[in-house]
Amino acid sequence: MTKTVYVLNGPNLNLLGTREPQVYGSQTLADVEQLCTAACARHGLALVFRQSNHEGALVDWIHEASRLHAAGQLAGVVLNAAAYTHTSVALLDAVKGTGVPVVELHISNVHARESFRHHSYLAGAARAVMCGFGVQGYALAIDGLAQW
């Protein structure tokens, strides 16, 4: 049975490649999806790759992933909640309430940036937190999920 990895991207990540390239790099979200597709293929995993600027959509997708988790068909979720990392109790409750294995991911090193980015509501509920590896962090997170 092939397990699935969900890669969920939050607000403004659709602007990758043009938004603050000195912070986030020049690769686009389509480039990130290709990177994730290749990483999943190396491990024989299926990929669901999504982006939304809306908090509720991210919550719904975590709930969707939890159904695969309950059926033993989920490797895990890579969650780049972007700004919602620092504000969303709803995402925290979704992760805690479903028990899905989550890797919290940030392209930049959030701890080297503005102080408001240093706090994560999600970190305590995530299995792992990755930041500062650029978009390559997505592939590293998938590699980690494949080992669990």
From Swiss-Prot:
Associated pathway: Metabolic intermediate biosynthesis; chorismate biosynthesis; chorismate from D-erythrose 4-phosphate and phosphoenolpyruvate: step 3/7
What is one GO biological process annotated to this record? quinate catabolic process
Task: Give the keywords, sorted.
Answer: Amino-acid biosynthesis, Aromatic amino acid biosynthesis, Lyase
Q: Does the keyword Lyase apply?
A: yes
Family annotation (InterPro entries) = DHquinase_II, DHquinase_II_CS, DHquinase_II_sf
- The UniProt site entry described as Transition state stabilizer is assigned to 19
Citing just one GO molecular function, the answer is: 3-dehydroquinate dehydratase activity
Give the residues annotated as active site: 24, 106
Q: How does it assemble?
A: Homododecamer.
Q: Which HAMAP family match?
A: AroQ
| NCBIfam families in UniProt | aroQ, PRK05395.1-2, PRK05395.1-3, PRK05395.1-4
Family that this chain belongs to: Belongs to the type-II 3-dehydroquinase family.
- Report what the protein is called: 3-dehydroquinate dehydratase
Q: Which organism is it from?
A: Acidovorax ebreus (strain TPSY)
